[in-house]
Amino acid sequence: AQNESTLEDEDCRTSDWLELFNSTANSINLGGWYLTDDPEEPAKWRLPDLPLDANERTIIFASNQDRTEGELHTDFRLNRNGGYLALIQPDGVTVASSYLYPSQIADISYGTLGLEQSQGSFRNPTPGDPNVAPQGTYLLEKVAFSHESQVITGQLNLTLTTPVPGTTIRYTTDVTSSNPTWRTYNRPISIRETTRVTARLEQAGKEPGPLRDRTFIKLGSGMENVRSNLPLIIVDSFRRNLDGESSANSQNPKRPVHGIFIDVDSDSGLASPTDLPDFEGRGGMRVRGQTSSGFAKKQYSFETWDSEGEDKDVSIFGFPEESDWVIHAPYSDKSLMRNKIVYETSLEMGYPAVRTRFCELYLNTNGGDVSAADYRGVYVFMEKIKRNSDRVNIKQLEKCDNDQPSITGGYIFKKDKGQSVDVTFNTKREGHSLAFVEPDQPTQAQKTWLDSHLDRFEDTLWGSRFDHPTRGYRNFIDVKSFIDTHIWVELYKNIDGYRLSSYFYKDRGRKIVASPVWDYNLSLGNADYLQGEFPNGWYYTQLSSNAYPWYNRLFLDPEFVIQYWDRWFELREGIFDTGAMMARIDNHTAKLNAPARRNFQRWRILGNHLWPNAQVWTPPSPLPGSDRNLAGARNRRSYRDEIDWMKGWLTARLDWIDTQRDNPPVFSRDGGIISGVASLLISNPNTRRGQIYYTTDG
């Protein structure tokens, strides 16, 4: 159940595996029998036709892939922390063989040995062959704790117990050392300050048991009275100064932390540090961001870990289970919401954008109690761009996927500021520097395939018949996604758009999709360069062709242009309607009013110019608060000023883009069921005269 390198399946994955053995002297067929990991669901996974000769063994992968041809794969995985496994007879009820297995150790198999069928572990797994001694040299049981991890306001006495007679409990409270001091437990441990207790069982002649830990976060005076209408995140780094390790040019390792994530109460609508957490547990954390790592208010990468320091998929704030997260810090974005607005509109439009929640963060790095001094402000807790069924849902590329058709996907790649760890390549025709996101370490064959595929795309795009509907560029890209991405960048005038922060994915046998959106904090006027603060003007005209991938040629196709503007006006009647956009901002503002006051008490930046805040443009009248001079960051002295300025900018931007193309004809009535004959008038809403064409051929 913790196969890391023992056995690979046909996909080159080290999936969980189990072995079935016919110990009888006769041939049998297990077709119609069942395997299950749940005693409440005995008929969980039905075995296909499976003949076994006398004393024959067969391997089945517990990978959740549900395959009944070729190598067999169950529709469940095995729990590495211990669980139930059973073989059920064809009646779907009768148990033929079963046992409860304990917590597993990486690449140590667990099973039976000899005629006695004794259960235990094997240092040298033998899939497909008989189990061989020695067996049972590992302690698999875990120490029991009298208390779960929690916040404390006073002293707590922690009792440790062993489920195995004759074993010794050893524990440590050393979190950061690579060579911690282990003590023998003989009396309750008095917890008076923030402490993590890690314990294991030991016994002569056996390897130490698996680690288990509990963490207790001490709240300082007054913290029990904290209330917020946003979720709270409390992180303790065990005296490690995470902010002091920030660097724009390298990725520092994630440091051990403990995180507590508290959602708002469904009845009161508030969250408090003493509330039952939505999730609490071990993790790793570091400062993230190249430019933003230099800001006073840091943003962080956060990873959820198990007791061994390995990735652990969990659900936080109702998001699908994963281990990689981002705690984003709006800083120069004084609206606190630019990224969230873009991510949620993209998600609502059906793209795999990251999910987000506003929250408030407390980060304790000095080793004392968590106090008001540890308040870091309003943050956005969000997902990271990754391949999985709940984020970017594409096939996983394994190291053996080096031939057609498997080599054709799934890839995630980006045009962005590079890190030294990125695997990069350059397109030949337009010369774009791109980097792999998934797989992050592709095989040479995979790297060559994607590079060549994009070269073929560019050759076609710049060919004489590039606009052919089936053999032109449309054969390579999902046109709608490229149009929507262009609209997002231009509508919000994202100064990192096109040239940076541009992500693409390609699933197996599918076209390239321009998505997900990423990093829009320098949008909606929040940039004093490349004309970013002005709501008029196309952003792409500020860029060189190398910074504007593929669109120069795409817009030479009249059909692409027509499709683009049809999409624009379609969105203007829905999600990008001016009233809908203003309502979205107002809803977020109402939720953020009180937290924003606390944020700007912590970070006294209102009325100050932070790079790259807009300095010149001001909203025209009539707008809420338009009697105030909102030009220049120094004149925007309140949170309301920042919101009004952004709303004014967005309104002007929507209006300006509308003027760049004739508006579509207006119908005198909506579609629907009619009785009898109905008249329909079609009129031209534009000031310029023109001919209206229509069709009734749907």
PLM segments and residue spans:
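Acidic glycine-/aspartate-rich tracts in secreted/extracellular proteins
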Residues: 1-3, 23-27, 39-41, 63-67, ...
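A structural motif detector for short, solvent-exposed N-terminal "entry" segments of globular domains
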Residues: 1-39, 77-81, 99-104, 134-144, ...
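Solvent-exposed beta-edge/loop recognition patches
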Residues: 2-16, 41-120, 248-254
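Beta-strand signatures of extracellular beta-sandwich domains
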Residues: 19, 34-36, 84-86, 168-172, ...
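Short, compositionally stereotyped local motifs that mark structural "simplifiers"
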Residues: 51-54, 60, 104-249, 263-264, ...
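Middle-to-C-terminal accessory/interaction subdomains
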Residues: 98, 118-122, 128-139, 229-232, ...
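Conserved NTP-binding catalytic cores of kinases and kinase-like/nucleotidyltransferase enzymes
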Residues: 149-151, 161-163, 215-344
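Internal "kinase-insert"/substrate-recognition segments embedded within catalytic cores
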Residues: 299-331, 350-354, 369-487, 495, ...
